[in-house]
């Protein structure tokens, strides 16, 4: 397993030229590695065995397992009644709906002296049935949502996501990787051409002077439109990151059939150590044992229903993976949203842009920084910020000093020492 995941670690290594900021890197690179690791972990049969294992009296067990894996399994729906809903249902009314199965239970069920209204077309809770029938209660002990079905009383909940988990994770990894791939194409190795060979702390004098003259010439040349498009494309990729995080939260909600709305209520039970409710909510989406119905036809064409019990070992891991991914996507959406707000503030405020450049400089006054940035557009500023994190700090300070002197000589004013 480690040998399969090890190549992904190279994707997290820092490059000599950084074309993404920290939020972009976490969003596109770290998330992709997490998703690919989860998909590899789920596909490792040596740890979890086959994705489904069924128990049956039939000899052709492999056929049954393949059928249940292909057609899907189900559990009996567990209704989560509140106190008010439970007060509306009496034992006698529940038992009367299935007299054949509850013939022995109706004589022992407690009688209610008060008149209770019932809703039409009422479908009873699986747990409520078990409270008034001992045999059915024993069957419920197999697993949550696994027991005999009662016509008109129980409802099936199909686990349609189980076969698609690995495919979903691979698709999500591609979606999260797309903005970084798009920006890498749009960036066109511009920063590498500007900042190569000058990112180290120690530079030869010849390289230092050559690169300094090249950067001064570049930022004194009018590339206003090109730099604005450069910045606009990067901001578009940041917006894409935010939208992808939000959409993936919604996708998980739909994919898991509204689990997260229930899961938030389950979190409230942790301070009270209500693990029974926690287990019920978790088992309604990630059951470890489920039912599977296989049709077997006789010689005359009569269909016989084979009720099989299936173990879903991958749900042990699916439960942890999706809980983590939901929290991770929420964190990514929050970070991307805050990053966009900061980007908007930088675009609207020249003062903030000057302060950001000044934070990269030491021993340079605010007035000199302001003069060096006087003729630079917002696109020029954006590219200069990218250059500042990829070059030697001393080289960047000398670049700003050169620009300040050029602006001063062009205006005909005198320049005081920046220190």
Swiss-Prot record:
Tell me the membrane topology, using the record's own terms: Multi-pass membrane protein
**Membrane-crossing residues?**
22-42, 163-183, 239-259, 321-341
Q: What is its main location?
A: membrane
Q: Pull one GO CC term from this UniProt entry.
A: membrane
Q: In which tissues is it expressed?
A: Expressed in the cortex of the pupal CNS and at low levels in the wing imaginal disk.
The chain's Cytoplasmic topological domains, given as residue ranges, are 1-21, 184-238, 342-419
Gene Ontology biological-process annotations? intercellular transport; monoatomic ion transmembrane transport; phototransduction
Q: Name one GO molecular function term.
A: gap junction channel activity
Question: Signal peptide position in this chain?
Answer: none
Alphabetic keyword roster: Cell junction, Cell membrane, Gap junction, Ion channel, Ion transport, Membrane, Transmembrane, Transmembrane helix, Transport
Coiled coil feature spans: none
Which residue intervals are topologically Extracellular? 43-162, 260-320
Subcellular location field: Cell membrane; Cell junction, Gap junction
> What family is this protein classified in?
Belongs to the pannexin family.
This molecule's function is given as: Structural component of the gap junctions.
PANTHER family from the entry? Answer: INNEXIN (PTHR11893), INNEXIN INX4-RELATED (PTHR11893:SF43)
Know the name of this protein? Innexin inx5
Q: Which organism is it from?
A: Drosophila melanogaster (Fruit fly)
Gene name of the encoded protein? Inx5
């Amino acid at each position: 397993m480690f040998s399969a995941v090890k190549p992904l670690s190279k994707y997290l290594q820092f490059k000599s030229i950084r074309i993404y900021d920290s939020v972009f890197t976490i969003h596109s690179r770290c998330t992709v590695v997490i998703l690919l690791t989860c998909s590899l972990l789920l596909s490792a049969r040596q740890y979890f065995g086959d994705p489904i294992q069924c128990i049956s009296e039939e000899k052709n067990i492999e056929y049954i397992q393949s059928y249940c894996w292909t057609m899907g399994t189900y559990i009996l729906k567990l209704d989560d009644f509140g106190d008010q809903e439970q007060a509306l249902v009496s034992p006698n009314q529940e038992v009367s709906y299935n007299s054949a199965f509850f013939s022995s239970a109706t004589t022992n069920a407690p009688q209610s002296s008060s008149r209770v209204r019932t809703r039409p077309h009422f479908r009873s809770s699986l747990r409520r049935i078990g409270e008034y029938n001992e045999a059915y209660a024993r069957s419920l002990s197999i697993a949550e949502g696994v027991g005999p079905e009662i016509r008109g009383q129980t409802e099936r909940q199909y686990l349609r996501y189980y076969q698609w988990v690995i495919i979903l994770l691979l698709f999500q990894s591609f979606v999260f990787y797309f903005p970084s791939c798009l920006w890498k194409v749009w960036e066109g190795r511009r920063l590498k051409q500007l900042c190569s060979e000058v990112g180290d702390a120690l530079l030869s004098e010849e390289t230092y002077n050559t690169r300094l003259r090249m950067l001064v010439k570049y930022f004194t040349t009018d590339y206003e439109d090109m730099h604005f498009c450069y910045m606009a494309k990067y901001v578009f990729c940041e917006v894409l990151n935010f939208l992808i995080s939000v959409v993936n939260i919604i996708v998980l909600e739909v994919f898991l059939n509204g689990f997260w709305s229930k899961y938030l209520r389950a979190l409230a039970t942790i301070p009270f150590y209500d693990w029974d409710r926690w287990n019920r909510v978790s088992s309604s989406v990630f059951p470890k044992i489920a039912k599977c119905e296989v049709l077997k036809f006789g010689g005359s064409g009569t269909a016989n229903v084979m009720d099989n019990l299936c173990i879903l070992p991958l749900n042990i891991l699916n439960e942890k993976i999706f809980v983590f991914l939901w929290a991770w996507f929420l964190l990514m959406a929050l970070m991307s949203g805050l990053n966009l707000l900061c980007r908007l503030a930088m675009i609207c405020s020249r003062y903030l842009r000057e302060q950001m450049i000044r934070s990269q400089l030491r021993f340079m006054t605010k007035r000199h920084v302001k003069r060096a940035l006087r003729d630079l557009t917002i696109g020029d500023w954006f590219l200069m910020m990218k250059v500042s994190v990829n070059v030697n700090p001393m080289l960047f300070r000398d670049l700003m000093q050169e620009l300040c002197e050029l602006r001063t000589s062009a205006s005909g004013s005198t320049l005081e020492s920046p220190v």
